[in-house]
């Protein structure tokens, strides 16, 4: 089980990222607009840098929904490989069966 503080930190990053996503993407699109002057684009870069670091989507870590484990998380199910194997073995994941040939 991961530390509760690490899980909470990641959740707050997700909330900040969702809240500031539109503002961040608007600034980025204006920065890459070649019709603007260099001074205007530079001021937009500074405005982007003033946003909180944790509002960037790259700082969000995929974590297991059950245990909070940061590694080995499957995108499709949102849980770690260990818990996925355990749940599949019990037959709790619909549509997934253990391979046998």
Curated annotation (Swiss-Prot):
Which GO terms fall under molecular function for this chain's record? Answer: rRNA binding; structural constituent of ribosome
Q: Name one GO biological process term.
A: translation
Could you name the Gene Ontology cellular component terms for this entry?
A: cytoplasm; small ribosomal subunit
Disordered: region residues: 1-25
The UniProt regions of compositional bias labelled Basic residues, in chain numbering, are 10-25
Residues annotated as signal peptide: none
Query: Which InterPro entries does the annotation name?
Result: Ribosomal_uS14, Ribosomal_uS14_bac/plastid, Ribosomal_uS14_CS
Q: Does the keyword Methyltransferase apply?
A: no
* UniProt KW keywords: Ribonucleoprotein, Ribosomal protein, RNA-binding, rRNA-binding
Among its keywords, does the record have RNA-binding? yes
Question: What is the role of this chain?
Answer: Binds 16S rRNA, required for the assembly of 30S particles and may also be responsible for determining the conformation of the 16S rRNA at the A site.
Under NCBIfam families, the record lists: PRK08881.1 (NF006477)
**Family, per the entry?**
Belongs to the universal ribosomal protein uS14 family.
Instruction: Describe the subunit structure.
Output: Part of the 30S ribosomal subunit. Contacts proteins S3 and S10.
| Annotated protein name in UniProt | Small ribosomal subunit protein uS14
Task: Give the organism the record lists.
Answer: Rickettsia typhi (strain ATCC VR-144 / Wilmington)
Q: Which gene encodes it?
A: rpsN
């Amino acid at each position: 089980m991961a530390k509760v503080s690490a899980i909470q930190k990641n959740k707050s990053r997700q909330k900040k990222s969702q809240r500031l996503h539109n503002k961040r993407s608007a600034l980025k699109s204006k920065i890459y607009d070649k019709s603007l002057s260099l001074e205007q684009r530079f001021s937009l870069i500074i405005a982007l840098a003033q946003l909180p670091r944790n509002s960037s989507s790259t700082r969000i870590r995929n974590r297991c929904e059950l245990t909070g484990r940061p590694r080995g998380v499957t995108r499709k199910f949102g849980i770690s490989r260990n818990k996925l194997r355990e749940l599949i073995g019990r037959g709790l994941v619909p549509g997934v069966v253990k391979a046998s040939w």
